[in-house]
Amino acid sequence: DMKDLERCLQEAQAQRFRIVVTDGVFSMDGNVAPMDRICDLAEKYDALVMVDESHSAGVVGATGHGVSELYKTHGRVDIYTGTLGKAFGGALGGFTTGRKEIIDLLRQRSRPYLFSNSLAPGIIGASLEVFKMLKESNALHDKLVENVNYFRDKMTAAGFDIKPTQSAICAVMLYDAKLSQIYAARMQEEGIYVTGFYYPVVPKDQARIR
């Protein structure tokens, strides 16, 4: 809601700092944040921009560099956060990157960074290797996009309602909460892991499996 974002930024003009924080891809519907418009407003009202690329890094964009690649906003985003537990396959852990001045500050002042145990070396090593692989070749990303499109096309042809999205998230809309739980339980019996989501996680009458 860009109008509401602009209203919030206008109301925050008296504050010393302003920061716009958004998901790159919203996990329930798979819809993508309009980063170009968000950055335009942030620059207009002198605000920082922070984007969580957990559901978009490794997936969205021509080479999987996330929504900032999709909307060509590299250099306009100040802070990126992400996870090693999704497209990068490290099972757990996450990262924050961005402008050097901000990262230097976080190393000194971020309590989660200062007072948390570090990740296991094996996870770090595997994750670094994944980043290296993605730099060297687009093959894994391209295959993922191919698989997502195949799944979406076949499910739609079979009569299922799939929310349109530029991401890899394919929410299969069932609308009825009880039905979503029946579907999820039955699929898990077949060894297919899905979760049924219903109100209040999603709006009423918008139950789905994902």
What are these regions (language model features)?
Residues 1-51:
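Active-site phosphate-binding strand-loop segment of PLP-dependent enzymes
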Residues 2-4, 24-29, 56-59, 113-114, ...:
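Short, small-residue-enriched loops and turns at beta-alpha junctions
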Residues 49-50, 162, 194:
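Hydrophobic beta-strand scaffold residues
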Residues 54-56, 100, 120, 199-201:
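Short, ordered loop/turn segments at secondary-structure junctions
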Residues 63, 69-105:
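Active-site PLP attachment segment
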